[in-house]
């Protein structure tokens, strides 16, 4: 047994300067990371005789060692604390689980700019607008812009190899800058300028210019042009009716609503950019028991904004609840430093800002209610499945499925559920190779070999393994897994899910490795859980298969041609703008591709015609 932590001796060595501390347990695992303006004062508070917080008492009872890092300023300590939390994911810290990047709309720096969605680092030349709360909001905006201002959205490789306009031009969704006779550079630049103003929220400026153009065109008897401008004006006005525009300034704002109930905390962020509400997103940080609202919110603020190190993701203004604004100066300084400009916090908003905050708080509470109801449904389904199978507990389930088209591009999927539902970060796909096309038994065997042949952590061993298939698939799966579970502390139950004759949901037959077959009522919660994990596995496999099949079909026609390796294949597809364009090309056109001789062009031409 390890001796108790000697806090008295330790505290004698601690400075009064700002810094970060890391607390370790007996296994040398970091269990908590904190920051302090005065390290001595903050660390002493953990070891007082009377500590009210249950969480703090539990934390202190597990401390075996504390490391301290002194910093120059409190702001520096805040940033270092965030980096340590991200590195160690300590048990007693509030952890923000949603660390996805936010999408932007990009107007590229091309001569004829392209409009597209962008995620990740902003390395490409061009102008970025956003962030948007999700890809759906970006796609909706791009679709809308395509109808009002038909700026091209095709890839540069496709654009550069076109000699005539594509279908998007024919249906009025692209101005056709790839063909110089259709639209001049000046006209296209004007179109891009309208898009830029629209994305900046300057709708009135766009309307004013379009109205002027419509009137001029009408006076000059260019009625077709006047009608086009009229349609654009009407479309923008319809958008304005649907999109609430803030009366507030044109500053970017995030409005942070907060709610915490039944051990669940939610921060609902309403994103406002250039006066327009782009959308919102709810975040549910992982919180230890008995964590105060203030600690949850402070931890979220730091992790959320410092995780997105691109300055444009930090708005000029952040609106939040007064009761959660304990000590904002360090985080305000840190965010201003990262953003390279002043970031303002507003804690007692009135007018439009106050209404936004009230709306965000309501949405946060609604999101918690929805999550609790969903959790109750999942819990009920797990309980029903436990009772159906006579199991004491179910902590983890995995399900496998195979997808292919007539044996082509076979993909296996594995999805994972715990008692909160799908664990999507643990979903896996397996690219199946070296088997006879269409041999599902061999495909399943290969996937299971790759999944279970390596050493598994105890918590990663499933309680149930579902196989989407009948007796044959299940028996093959059992043969494979039985080779590896000898050293496992528990053996999973294996169940096959066979579709009914009509393949309708609710008519599934469940099969055990003993050969027992049984059905559940179509309204049984246990069956709904099985259908859920089966459908997740099926969809995950199909998505992977379609992507692989598409890639194979784009390149396979070139792979068998002697003298055409990966570099030449890439050059051909890039120069021509795709496989279909290459198939339509003449020998002379193919010979223009860098690195392709006339004789090789003839070989390629003949091979593609077969």
Curated annotation (Swiss-Prot):
Gene that this sequence comes from: uvrC
Keyword Cytoplasm: yes
Keywords: Cytoplasm, DNA damage, DNA excision, DNA repair, Excision nuclease, SOS response
TM stretches of this protein: none
Main location per the UniProt record: cytoplasm
Entries under SMART domains matching the protein: GIYc (SM00465), HhH1 (SM00278)
Official protein name in the record: UvrABC system protein C
UVR domain: residues covered: 204-239
SUPFAM superfamilies for this protein: C-terminal UvrC-binding domain of UvrB, GIY-YIG endonuclease, RuvA domain 2-like
Domain GIY-YIG span(s) in chain numbering: 16-94
Function statement: The UvrABC repair system catalyzes the recognition and processing of DNA lesions. UvrC both incises the 5' and 3' sides of the lesion. The N-terminal half is responsible for the 3' incision and the C-terminal half is responsible for the 5' incision.
Entry-linked Pfam families: GIY-YIG, HHH_5, UVR, UvrC_RNaseH, UvrC_RNaseH_dom
Family: Belongs to the UvrC family.
Subcellular location: Cytoplasm
Family matches, as CDD domains: GIY-YIG_UvrC_Cho (cd10434)
Quaternary structure, from the entry: Interacts with UvrB in an incision complex.
Provenance organism: Vibrio parahaemolyticus serotype O3:K6 (strain RIMD 2210633)
GO MF annotation terms: DNA binding; excinuclease ABC activity
GO biological process: nucleotide-excision repair; SOS response
GO cellular component terms given for this protein: cytoplasm; excinuclease repair complex
UniProt KW DNA damage keyword: yes
């Amino acid at each position: 047994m390890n001796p108790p932590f000697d806090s008295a001796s330790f505290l004698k060595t601690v400075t009064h300067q700002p810094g970060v501390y890391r607390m370790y347990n007996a296994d040398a695992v970091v269990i908590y990371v904190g920051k302090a303006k005065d390290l001595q004062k903050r660390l002493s508070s953990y070891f007082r005789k009377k500590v009210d917080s249950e969480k703090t008492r539990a934390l202190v009872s597990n401390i075996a060692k504390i490391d301290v890092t002194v910093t120059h300023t409190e702001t520096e300590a805040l940033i270092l604390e965030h980096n340590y939390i991200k590195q160690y994911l300590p048990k007693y810290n509030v952890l923000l689980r949603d660390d996805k990047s936010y999408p932007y709309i990009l107007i590229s720096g091309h001569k004829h700019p392209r409009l597209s969605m962008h995620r990740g680092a902003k390395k490409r030349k061009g102008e970025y607008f956003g962030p948007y709360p999700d890809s759906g909001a970006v796609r909706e905006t791009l679709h809308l812009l395509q109808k009002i201002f038909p700026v091209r959205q095709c890839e540069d490789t496709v654009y550069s190899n076109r000699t005539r306009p594509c279908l998007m031009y024919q249906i009025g969704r692209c101005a056709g800058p790839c063909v110089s006779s259709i639209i001049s550079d000046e006209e296209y630049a004007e179109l891009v300028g309208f898009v830029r103003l629209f994305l900046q929220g300057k709708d009135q400026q766009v309307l004013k210019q379009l109205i002027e153009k419509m009137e001029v065109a009408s006076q000059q008897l260019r009625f077709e042009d006047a009608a086009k401008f009229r349609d654009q004006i009407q479309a923008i006005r319809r958008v304005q009716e649907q999109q609430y525009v803030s009366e507030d300034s044109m500053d970017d704002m995030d409005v942070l609503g907060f709610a915490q109930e039944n051990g669940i905390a939610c921060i609902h962020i309403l994103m406002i950019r250039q006066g327009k509400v782009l959308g919102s997103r709810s975040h549910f940080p992982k919180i230890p028991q008995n964590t105060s609202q203030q600690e949850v919110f402070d931890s979220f603020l730091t992790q959320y904004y410092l995780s997105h190190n691109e300055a444009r993701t930090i708005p000029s203004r952040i609106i939040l609840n007064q009761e959660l604004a304990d000590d904002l100066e360090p985080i305000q300084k840190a965010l201003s430093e990262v953003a390279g400009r002043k970031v303002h916090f507003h804690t007692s908003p009135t007018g439009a800002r106050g209404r936004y905050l009230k709306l965000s708080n309501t949405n946060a509470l609604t999101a918690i209610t929805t999550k609790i109801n969903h959790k109750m449904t999942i819990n009920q389904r797990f309980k029903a499945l436990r009772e159906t199978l006579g199991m004491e507990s179910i902590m983890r389930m995995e399900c496998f499925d195979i997808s292919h088209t007539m044996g082509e591009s076979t993909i296996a999927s594995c999805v994972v559920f715990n008692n909160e539902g799908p664990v999507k970060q643990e979903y896996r796909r397996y690219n199946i190779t070296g088997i006879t096309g269409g041999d599902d038994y061999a495909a399943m065997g290969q996937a299971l070999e790759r999944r279970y042949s390596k050493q598994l952590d105890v918590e990663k061993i499933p309680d149930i393994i579902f196989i989407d298939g009948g007796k044959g698939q299940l028996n093959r799966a059992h043969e494979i897994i039985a080779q590896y579970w000898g050293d496992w502390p528990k053996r999973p139950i294996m169940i096959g899910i066979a579709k009914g004759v009509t393949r309708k949901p609710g008519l599934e037959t469940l099969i055990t490795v003993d050969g027992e077959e049984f059905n559940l009522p179509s309204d049984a919660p246990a069956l709904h859980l099985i259908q859920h994990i089966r459908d997740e596995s099926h969809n995950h496999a199909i998505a992977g298969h379609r992507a692989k099949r598409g890639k194979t079909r784009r390149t396979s026609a070139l792979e068998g041609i002697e003298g055409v390796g990966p570099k030449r294949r890439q050059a051909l597809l890039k120069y021509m703008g795709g496989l279909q364009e290459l198939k339509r090309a003449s020998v002379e056109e193919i010979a223009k591709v860098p690195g392709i001789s006339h004789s090789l062009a003839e070989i390629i031409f003949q091979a593609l015609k077969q």
